[in-house]
Amino acid sequence: MPSIRRYLRHLWLSFTLLPGLASAHALEIHGSNTIGATLAPMLMTGFLQQLTGNPVTARPTGTANETVLATSYNGKPMTVLVAAHGTSTGFSALAADHADIWAASRRVKGSEREAMATRADLTSPASEHVIAIDGLAILVHPSNPVEQLNIDTLARVFAGEISNWSEVGGPDRPIRIYARDEQSGTWDTFKELVLAGRYNLTPSAQRYESNDQLSNDVSNDPSGIGFAGFASAGNSKLLAIADGNAPALKPSALSVATEDYPLARRLYLYTAGNTGEPLARQFIEYVQSPTGQAIVAESGFFPQTPFAVDLPPDASVPDTFRRLTEHYQRLSVNFRFAEGRTQLDNKARRDLQRVQQYLQDSGKTGRDLMLIGFADQQSHELRAQMISELRALSAAKALREMGTRVQGYVGYGHYMPVGSAGGESGARRNGRVEVWVRR
């Protein structure tokens, strides 16, 4: 049964509101500070301008990290609330029907999915929407000579087991830790990808609600190290990060967009599926459109609009792979998979459409594509080869069903990993299909 709140807003959108109810917000977005600080207001401003044809103004509510966007629609006032108090607060608001859209800088947890199961499946394509990619940047002072750390060493630093920069190749100086607060999806992501249940954050860490404030403080502290969304890196220096034996990578346009960077993460909007607010679904479609993704790029995050890159020569790449791709550019898309080994995930389903649009815009066809599947390390090399081939075939079949016939697809087994072999996170990242396009 629709809530009273949703019913009143339906009345508002029909312009039959009773006196005294005109202050109801047309939409409410609650959750991640990473999304809500800048990205969500920018996206909503663009959406409202397109919807109404009128200017949009932003004003504070009097509560920290909250913004109201105001415009008029058919002569009536229209407002949208963006409340950016952390990912977990957004789920609570969505579950309580106090929010139409939950902004999350991590994926929905199993317990959260179960709690909402009677209203919507939050992992379904109708409810789960990847809107951008962010790199969880590891920040140090610009003068710090340390260039890279592996994830285990990074975890030991944040746990306080490594407490002096000289232990990791830096100056003889104590390490000061800066971290996001407990309500933050950024913290949840760091805890999952770095601490990984093996380490606890040192009690001496300074905690922050704001990415930007954390980054600013690290950039002014020669002893400091912290983490924040890539868009909030500011004047801090970025470290390259290695996952296991995989190469260390800095967050860059290609490494983050393809999610090859070990600390790349997806930014999500969640809705109550087809039972949710229709205006929210319109907003989601706007965000996923080329116009919306251009705003994502403008905000400093990584859009999902594909672009092609000529990769420089790399001596670590096997000769067979170099010959396979010598006439191709790397596209900034990796197809990844859901629970099944060959089932494309929700982002990949959208990416199929984006790749198809890229081909149309660039005057190319499926014959110009090369899909290269990869697998995590398996019990037998032939098994990894088979899984990688099935993944490439799965992506080629999905494109063919959309009218794009891909002639070039191949499996490359467990070679060229981008994540630690054998672990859950590494397995998700290593199990991928790279997209290459003929020059």
Question: Model segments located where?
Answer:
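Periplasmic OmpA-like peptidoglycan-binding domain that tethers envelope proteins to the cell wall
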Residues: 364, 374-439
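Flexible loop/hinge segments at secondary-structure junctions
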Residues: 24-341, 346-350, 356-360, 425-429, ...
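Hydrophobic anchor at the start of a short beta-strand
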Residues: 236, 369, 406-407
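Conserved C-terminal helix/tail region of periplasmic/extracytoplasmic solute-binding proteins
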Residues: 357-362, 367-372
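N-terminal secretory signal peptides that target proteins for export/translocation
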Residues: 1-7
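Short coil/turn segments at beta-strand junctions that form active-site/ligand-binding loops
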Residues: 25, 222-223, 365-367, 405
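Short loop/turn segments at strand-loop or loop-helix junctions that form parts
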Residues: 337-338, 371-376
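Bacterial N-terminal signal peptides
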Residues: 9-20
